[in-house]
Amino acid sequence: MVTLDFSAMEAKWRDAWYEARINESEPEPGKKKFFMIFAYPGVTGYMHVGHMRGYSVTDAIVRYKMMTGHRVLFPVGTHATGNGAIGFARKVERGDPATIEQLKANGCTEETIRSLSDPMEVVKFFSQVYVNDYWKRFGFMSDWRRFTSTVNPDYSKFIEWQMRKLMSLGLLVQRPYFAPACVEHGPVAIDASETDISKGGGAEVLEYTL
């Protein structure tokens, strides 16, 4: 009976694809073009299988387009602005047991864990984890040279331009916005169950207008 080593097969062909650089895209006049991107993951910690399911769908589409004669551009990035990285850094800073244990279980040294009390270090650390430990391990056809993050200076300039453009067209309106928040963990909680994350949710909800 033949025994197949699927892990070895996976590594063999993944390495062959990247060595051949078939994932990299350059302009090619006259060839059909196709652009693909998935929603940047927030830099809030390690991913779960649900993330990879969605990303695998985009990769399947990209591969189909490549096989049907398209020049495909498939960049990736991380959503590092907002409260995600800040919230994670605060957990590390105050020594949240579950967060520290998760980092240790994933092989982080004490030095690395201490550094993750800085939100920018959280962004740098998990951006590398997402690319190297998840997306590349899955063999995605992303052009890794085109990785970006929403905290990169050039990306920030793009957002500034976008906001000014929308403002000039009268498409931005400032109004009161109501959202759940936690005075300990910071705004804005995704839903009421996250207003006391440290106790597993289900906290009492009090409404205020600030």
What positions do the PLM features span?
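N-terminal, positively charged nucleic-acid-binding surface of large information/translation enzymes
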Residues: M1-L210
